Amino acid sequence: METIDIQNRSFVVRWVKCGRGDVINYQIKPLKKSIEVGIYKKLKSSVDDHASAVHIAPDTKTLLDYTTKSLLHKGSSSNIEEHHRRSSQHSHSSSNGSDNKRKERSYSSLSISGIQQQSQEIPLREKLSASGFTLVKRVGNVSGNTMVQGDLEVKDTDYYYAFILDNSSSKNAKKKILFNASVINGDNQSMISTRSTPPARPTALSRTSTQQDMLFRVGQGRYLQGYLLKKRRKRLQGFKKRFFTLDFRYGTLSYYLNDHNQTCRGEIVISLSSVSANKKDKIIIIDSGMEVWVLKATTKENWQSWVDALQTCFDDQFEDKDTSTLEENPDILDDDKEVINKSSPQDHDHLTPTATTKSALSHRQHTQKDMDDIYVPLPSESYATFSMNLRLIQQRLEQCKKDSLSYKPTTLHQRSEGLNGTHSSSSVFTNNRVSSFNHSSSGMTSSDSLASEEVPSNKTYIEHALYNQLADLEVFVSRFVTQGEVLFKDHQILCKKAKDTRVSLTSYLSENDEFFDAEEEISRGVIILPDTEDDINNIVEETPLLGKSDQNEFTKEVQLSGSEQIASSSVESYTTNDENHSRKHLKNRHKNRRRGHPHHQKTKSAQSSTETFTSKDLFALSYPKSVTRRNDIPEAAASPPSLLSFLRKNVGKDLSSIAMPVTSNEPISILQLISETFEYAPLLTKATQRPDPITFVSAFAISFLSIYRDKTRTLRKPFNPLLAETFELIREDMGFRLISEKVSHRPPVFAFFAEHLDWECSYTVTPSQKFWGKSIELNNEGILRLKFKTTGELFEWTQPTTILKNLIAGERYMEPVNEFEVHSSKGDKSHILFDKAGMFSGRSEGFKVSIIPPPSSNRKKETLAGKWTQSLANETTHETIWEVGDLVSNPKKKYGFTKFTANLNEITEIEKGNLPPTDSRLRPDIRAYEEGNVDKAEEWKLKLEQLQRERRNKGQDVEPKYFEKVSKNEWKYITGPKSYWERRKKHDWSDISQLW
C-alpha cells in the first residue's frame, strides 16, 4: 500500500483507469486520525472541455490572463468574477481614451497567489460538481487505524474513476493514509495494480545540486522524474523544491517531498486538466478544476522537457483513445513517443538524464499547421449524408430489436454444421471488421463491439441471421463513426477560426448566453495569445470563412453579444469614465434582453399581456384591510459582550471554530437585515413617475446606510441563517412584496427578489469581511438590478463599502467609504462620493451625488448633497429627495432599531398561518432572544447549528427551493407553479425540509 499525505483543509484525488466488466479492489487505512472518503467518476470525453495542448504564453502577464480566464469559465472560484469586477473598476477609473477601451476588452488577471487562493476557497462539493464528477459510492468517514476494503464493479467504459480523500473539514490536523486500488480484469481475472512499485530513484546524498536539476527516465521509459519548484498553498510562502513524477501510461503527474520520500502528496490527470506555460519565467500552471499547481523549472531546458512531456499526455489522449493498446504495450512510449532522448543500450532501469525534446512534437505541430493552411470546408452534402445515416442506424437497430424477440438458439449439432461451412469466410469478414472498427473507435470502446472479440478457434461459433445483421450494422456504424470524426474535425476548425475573432469578448458571460468553452480557443495545437487589439483584428481579416460583408455583420453580432455579456455579468462595464461606452453597453443589453433571447421572442401585444397578467397577479398585496404593525420591540435583556474580553478568553484558539455567545446578536437574521434595503421602497415608486428617475433611484441606493445612524446598532450582529432558510416581507401599505433565501452556506450567498406593480428588483449578495486590527471592512458583494415595468428602463449598482471602527475600544460606529455609481440603461448615471473623515473628527456623514445625463441629452448636470444619517436634497432647487424615518422609542435599549426593522420579526395577520416552516420569524432561537429568554436562545442556537453540521456531514444538506443558480454569482427567482408565491397561495409546503 502506498502512503499519502493530506494537508489540513485539503484533499487528494487518486485516479483509476478501468473498463467495463472490471472490478476495482481498494483498501484504505487512515493512520491515527479519520478521513472522509468518496468514490466518484468523471467522463473521459470531458477532456474535450479542456485545452488539448499545453498553452504557451509569451510572458507571465499573458499566462496569468489565460489562467484567470480559464478559472472564470470553469467555475473554479465563486469569488473570481467579483475580484475581476473590482479590479476592472479600478483600472477603468485610472485610464481613458484608447487605453481605456483596450482594458475594457481584456482580463484583469489575478496574481499567482490570487489564483491559488481563489481556487482553495471553493468548497469541495462545489468543485466536484463544477468539474463534472458523479458520486458512485460514499465510503463515508473512515476512523483512524481502521482498514476499509471493498470491491466496485465497473459498468461502463466512458469514465475515469477517482477516490476523493477529503480532509477539508480539518482546520489544523494533517492526515496520513495507506491506500491501494487494483483493477481485476473482467476477461481473464488478472489483477492490475493502478500504481506499480515506485521506480528506483537516485540517492539524494550522492547527488550534487547540478544533478538534482536534471531529469531522469526510469521504469523502461514509463516515468519522467525530476525536481520542480512548486508554489506553496498559502500566501507569501513562495516556491519550494519538490520531486515530480510523470507517468506516461496513465497520464498522471504526482509529486513528493523529495526523491527519497515515498509518500505521495498529490496527483493530477493531465488530460483532464488545463496546462499553460511561459518560457520566459519558466512557469507551468496546471489547473485540474479541483486544484491549481503553479510550477517553476530551474532551467529553460528542463522547462522545455516538462512542457513536451505534458504535451505528449494530451497527444496520447487525442490520437489514441483506445486505452487498451497502451495497457497491453507499456513500452510503446519508448518506441513511438519521443518524450526524451532514446535510452542507452544499458538496462532500462538504469537512470539516464534527458535532453530537450523540441523535435518530439514538431512533426505534429507542422502537420496541424499544414492542415489548417489547406483546409477546405466540407460541402453541405456531407452534413446531409450525416443526418441520413443517423436515420438509417435508427431503423436498423429497430429491426434488429424486433428480430431478437423471435430468435431461438439452434442446437449444438446445427451450430457445428453451420460453422464448418461458414468459418473461413466469416473469419476474413470479421477480421476486416476489426481493422475497420479499430481505425475509427474514437467514440466507442472495444468492450462494446462484437468485432472486439476474437474469432474462436474451437469452431463452436456460428453466424446466424441476427448475428449477421448486427455484424453488418457494426460495419455501418464504424463508417458512421469515421464520418463523425471528419465532421467533428471540420466543426472544430470552424469554431476555432470563429472563436479567434472574439478572444477578448468571451470573458464575461451572462446566464442567457450560449458559448464555447474558453479552452477551445487553443483547440488542437500550441497557440500564442494575441497581445494587442491589432492582432485580434488581423485574425478576423484573415479568416477565409467569411466574406467582407458577412465578416462585418459577424463582428457586429459578436460585439453586440459581448456588450450584453459584460453588462449582465457585473457592474464593471459601467464604471468606466467613457460615458459613451458605458451607455452603449447598457442599451445593447436592454435591447437584447427584450428581443434577442428565445424566451422573449414574442409580439408586442403578447409582451404587454404578459406584463398585465404579472401586474395583476401580485398575490398577497391586495389584502382587504389595513394591517396594524407594532412599530416597537422589547428592550434587550442582556448587554452585548465585550469583544476584547472575548478575545482574551480565547487566546491561541481558532476563532472561526468558536461560537460567539447569543448576546452578541440582534433579534433578526441576515435575511431580515438585508431586507431593510427596501425600507424606503416608495422612492422607487416615485421614480417611475418622474422624468428624472435616476435621482430617486440614487437616493434609494443610499438610504440603506441610515439603519446605522444610531451607533447602538453596530454593537451586535444579526443571526446567520441556516441553508435554505427564507424570509418573506409583504408591505401592502408600500405596495411591494419580497422573498429572500439563503442559497449557499460556504461561501454564504443570499438571494432576494422584490416586486411592485411598477418595478421589480433582484439581488444576489455575498457578505464579506476583512479584519484590519481595530476595524472591519464590510462588503456586500453583488449587483442590485432594478427594472421599471412600464418603460423597461434598467438600473444597476453595488452597495458601498462600509467600515466598522473602534472594534476593540472606544465608541463603535459604522461609516461608508470611497464611492460608488448607479447606472441606467438610458445612459444616465450618478456618482456618489462620501466625505472623508479626519483622524480625530469622528464619524463622517456627508456625501454628494452628481447626476450625469447622457451626452445626447439637453439636461444639465445636477448635484445633490446631504447626510446619510438625515436627508438628501437638490443643491439647486433645494427639493428634499429623501429623509430618514423614525427610530423606535428609547433605541439605545432596543438594539438601535428603526420602526421598520422592529416590524420585520413580527407575525402579523397577513403572515399568520401562511408562512413556510423555513421563515426566519419561526426560528426558535431568534424568537426566544427577542422575548428576553437568553438561556433558551443560546440552547436553541447551538442545537440548530449542530443539526446543520450533521446534515452536511451525512451529505443530506437541504437545497434552495425558490431560487436557481444562473451564473457563478447570480441566482434567479423561480417563476411558475413552483414559485414561492404560488406555493404560498396554495399553502403547499409539502416537500419543505424541517430546519428546526
Swiss-Prot record:
InterPro entries: GOLD_dom_sf (IPR036598), OSBP_sf (IPR037239), Oxysterol-bd (IPR000648), Oxysterol-bd_CS (IPR018494), PH-like_dom_sf (IPR011993), PH_8 (IPR041680), PH_domain (IPR001849). GO terms for cellular component: cortical endoplasmic reticulum; cytoplasm; cytosol; endoplasmic reticulum membrane; perinuclear endoplasmic reticulum; plasma membrane. Residues 221-315 form the PH domain. The keyword Cytoplasm applies. Residues 75-114, 338-372, 556-611 are annotated as: Disordered. Keywords: Cytoplasm, Endoplasmic reticulum, Lipid transport, Lipid-binding, Membrane, Phosphoprotein, Transport. The modification Phosphoserine is found at S190, S193, S324, S605. Residues 642-982 are annotated as: OSBP-related domain (ORD). The modification Phosphothreonine is found at T210, T323, T325, T352. It is found in: Cytoplasm; Endoplasmic reticulum membrane. A 1,2-diacyl-sn-glycero-3-phospho-(1D-myo-inositol 4-phosphate) binds at S657, I658, A659, M660, K717, H745, R746, E945, Q946, L947, Q948, R949. Residues 582-603 have a biased composition (Basic residues). Lipid transport protein (LTP) involved in non-vesicular transfer of lipids between membranes. Functions in phosphoinositide-coupled directional transport of various lipids by carrying the lipid molecule in a hydrophobic pocket and transferring it between membranes through the cytosol. Involved in maintenance of intracellular sterol distribution and homeostasis. May serve as a sensor of PI4P levels at PM-ER membrane contact site, regulating PI4P phosphatase SAC1 activity. May be involved in ergosterol transport from the plasma membrane (PM) to the ER, however it does not bind sterols directly. Belongs to the OSBP family. Present with 589 molecules/cell in log phase SD medium. This is Oxysterol-binding protein homolog 3. It comes from Saccharomyces cerevisiae (strain ATCC 204508 / S288c) (Baker's yeast). The lineage of its organism: Eukaryota, Fungi, Dikarya, Ascomycota, Saccharomycotina. The gene is OSH3.
